[in-house]
Each structure stands twice: as C-alpha cells, then as structure tokens.
C-alpha cells in the first residue's frame, strides 16, 4: 500500500490499491432443535447461544457452516450433513418499541444451492448488533432412503 504525505501531514492512501476487505462483526447465534425460540427469550438471554464472526459478504450457507461447525460437527451423534437450518434475524425496532423477528431463509448443509443458501447477508438487511435465531432440524428427505 502506497502512503504519501499530503500538505496537512496526514497520510493519504493511494487510489491504485483496493481496501483489504470488509470488517468482520460478531454475531450472537441462539439455537434450538426442532422449534423456534420466542423473541423475548432471546433478549433476556435465557437461551443457549454461541458467538461467530461473520461478514456482510458471506452467504447464508457459509453462516450455516460456521454454526454447524460449533454446534453439530463436534458431537459424534450429530456429525452428519443431513441438517437444515432455518435462520431468522431478531432486532429491536425502536419505532414500534418491541423486538421483531424476520425470516432470512433456510439452508441445507448437504447442498449450498438449495433454498436460500446463496443469499448474501448484506442482501438480507442484517446489521451489526442484530441477533440470529436458528432452528436446527434433520432433513427428513435426505435421511429416508
């Protein structure tokens, strides 16, 4: 990166170099098997959660893989790819003065192209500080053979 001094003695970045990349942010992920969490339980922190770092340029499938890596793939009983993750964002709406939940999509771990796996996080409207609620279900279509 070429840094040149200007007359004000503050460094200027050269226009020929692009930025290194977007900044990651911490995402609080609240999870439960088979059912959705209640919105108020998420804001009261009574539900188990994990923390993952994410980027706005990542897809829902990539977020699902990060979540599965911490929750599912470390346990011998749940170490298979036949899982579907229903992802929604939880945020506090200051105009309505209450928490709001909005579905982002469903991700299948065995195929990133199914459902909304290719959707970018920045296209979903998620912002820093929003919480993620994940419902983890076995993919019944793939398990029945």
UniProtKB/Swiss-Prot annotation:
Main subcellular location of this protein, as a coarse class: cytoplasm
Matches recorded under Gene3D superfamilies: ASAP complex, SAP18 subunit
Entry keywords, A to Z: Cytoplasm, Nucleus
Localization per Swiss-Prot or TrEMBL: Cytoplasm; Nucleus
CC terms in the record's Gene Ontology section: ASAP complex; cytosol; nucleus
Domain of life of the source: Eukaryota
GO BP term, example: mRNA cis splicing, via spliceosome
One Pfam assignment: SAP18
Similarity remark: Belongs to the SAP18 family.
Name this polypeptide is given: Uncharacterized protein C126.13c
The organism of origin for this protein: Schizosaccharomyces pombe (strain 972 / ATCC 24843)
């Amino acid at each position: 990166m070429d840094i040149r001094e200007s007359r004000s003695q503050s460094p200027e970045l050269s226009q020929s170099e692009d930025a290194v990349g977007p900044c990651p942010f911490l995402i609080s992920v609240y999870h439960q098997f088979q059912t959705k969490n209640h919105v108020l339980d998420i804001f009261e922190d009574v539900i188990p959660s994990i923390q993952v770092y994410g980027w706005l340029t990542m897809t829902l499938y990539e977020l699902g893989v990060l979540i599965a890596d911490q929750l599912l793939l470390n346990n011998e009983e749940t170490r298979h790819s036949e899982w579907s993750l229903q992802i929604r964002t939880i945020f506090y709406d200051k105009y309505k003065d209450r928490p709001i939940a909005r579905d982002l999509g469903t991700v299948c771990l065995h195929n990133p192209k199914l459902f909304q796996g290719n959707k970018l996080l920045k296209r979903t409207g998620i912002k820093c500080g929003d919480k993620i609620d994940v419902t983890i279900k076995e993919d019944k279509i793939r398990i029945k053979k």
